[in-house]
Amino acid sequence: MGKWTRRGVLSAGVVGGTGLVIGIAVRPGNPTETAGHLVTGKGENLLHIYLKIDDQNRATAILPHSEMGQGAQTALTQMLAEELDADWDLMRFEEAPADGAYANMALGRGYLFAGVNFPDAVVPTVDGLVLKLADALGMQITGGSMSIRSTGQYFIRAAGAAVREMLVNAASKAWGVPQDEIRTANSRLYHDTSGRSAPYSEFAAAAARVTPSSTPKLKKTGQFTVMGQSKPRHDIPSKVDGTAMFAMDVKRPGMVYAAIRRTPVAGGTLLRLDDSKARAMSGVIDVIKIDALKASGMLGAYSAGDSVAVVADSYWRAEKALAVLELEWSTEGKEQVSSASIFEQFDRDITAGVNRLVDVASGDADAAFDSATTLLTADYRVPYLAHTCMEPPNATAEVTADRAEIWIGCQNPLGFRQHLAANLGLDLEQVTLHNYFMGGGFGRKSNADYALQTAIIARRVGRPVQMVYSRAEDIKQDFYRPAVQSRFKAGLDADGKLIAWQNTYVDKHEPAEAPLIPYAVPTQDIGHVASPTHVPFGAWRSVDHSQHGFFTESFIDEAAHAAGRDPYEFRAEMLKDKPRLLAVLNRVAQEANWGRPMEEGRGRGISLQESFGSIVGQVVEVTVSGGKTWVDRVVAVIDAGYAVSPDGMKAQIESGIIYGLSAAMYGEITIEQGAVAQSSFADYDAIRMHDAPVMETHIINSGAAMGGAGEPGTPGVAPALANAI
């Protein structure tokens, strides 16, 4: 039986836009019939929705996740290979098609049957119902650090185990021996008593006719031989030799190119367009106005106003022509809006506290603060942030009256496909989507605006079109991490113990637990007020944890200093009843040699953050000289329950550290006269290689439920940096 909670689903960040994606191994029957023609070729047998075996005994994992550099596809393949007892050298992977057979059922199950335990016999029926819901909502999202901890742990492993049992079943019938006399290893079946053996491929066709078990037997941790190993990533060779396909590598016969510009002020409309100069330029084919896109499906608002695109015989010519367009846009009354005015609005709304919604309330806050010996207050602000994927949004599309085909890199292939069908007036079966490797996603590529813009342009010109955002357009037309202000008040008793904690912040997105603290503070009052702005927002790596991790861990340090306590010891005292959190905190302090004195001009800061099912402790060491700050070293410890691929987990944590440091040291989107001011890496910079710190990551395999790795490395680095300074 399995228990699903509504909070568990919501905390994955779906409602806020990040989302999760999981397929499921336990479904009514074996739905390979619906997907077989999409994923199999000559000599291949689809034994399970996630697994096929060819006549050369190669097993291919079919994975419902997009690959944007995180390496999850290799780790998921390890999980399948482990339970399949496969020879790693015979394993392959490919991304699942954008099809309802690979829709995510976890969200629907959480909403419909939160907290319900189902008897095993009922599970297939329940899952059949939930699959229809997930398919209808277009959920095939990669995000929320869910690939390994949900798709892998609960469904891909089960698929591998089920197929292994199916192969044993088929061999048992063919050989006329009991199933319990057959063993599996290295992609082969063995009957030791008779000396017979055969590759999986010999029985693949027969096994494909066997209904998979809804409760296959999974291995215990001590039995793992593939999981827990740092296997070479399957996608690296092609990325090194240049054969890996990204969306911008697509070339179609007769293809033309489009460059695009959207209204500078979100929500604006095009008032005047003079395209005479552009149309006179060599190679220009057309100039197209695109009305504000209409949202549909789960992804929310895809666009923030009108756009204009130039189509030409080369991308360079399209961009050059775009630059000479004479455009006049409406400002929607936002010409007086700036970053300063937005934060003034936040401050007013927090102070007024109108319709404040409570997240946590424990104890009597007024009484606790009245009894406190020391009171401490602070306000924190963080700006809007862009995603700045190294590969900007782009797509290639061919659209006719009765068909649309698109080549793209995105984080929700099924959702994008459904969105295209709805907005183009086509049936889903008339839309084909090919998803490719992404050069970064970070939440930006879960918004389908760039897909629909490309399709609209292609329909208008009647030819294949490749549309690419310039770096300026990418930065100016993002779905930003929200700017937030957060106000704190703390009370300390005569012994310097934290007895009261109050926090009010503007706007709540997801995950729900982001503003909560792990520390044992008897009186807590945490809540939020609404303070909407016109600036488009969306999922950004670690979602609300990126803001609240900075707020809470910075204020904890302020409280430690007010109490005259060491920040590490101050935290540790409040974690005595949370051994897993305390173990991470102790380990990171140990690995960083916390008690070692620092030289003049150098500092050290610590943070602890629980997010996406994982606990991460970080220590940052800095040098401050001449008004400049250098980050010298970052030590991280992660407890994600179990590391399927230790090197992959370390890479994700260190990637998150770099992303978080870039945001903390350089990242700031500012609003001037209602529009975004930044336009390139010249004014929206990132950590460069020569500025990158020495990083070391240590893993604790605690045996707890698996957590994520792609996002948890980001939230804690900013407060640790600030605390060090």
Question: Language-model segments: which ranges?
Answer:
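Cofactor-binding beta-sheet edge motifs in enzyme active sites
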Residues: 1-724
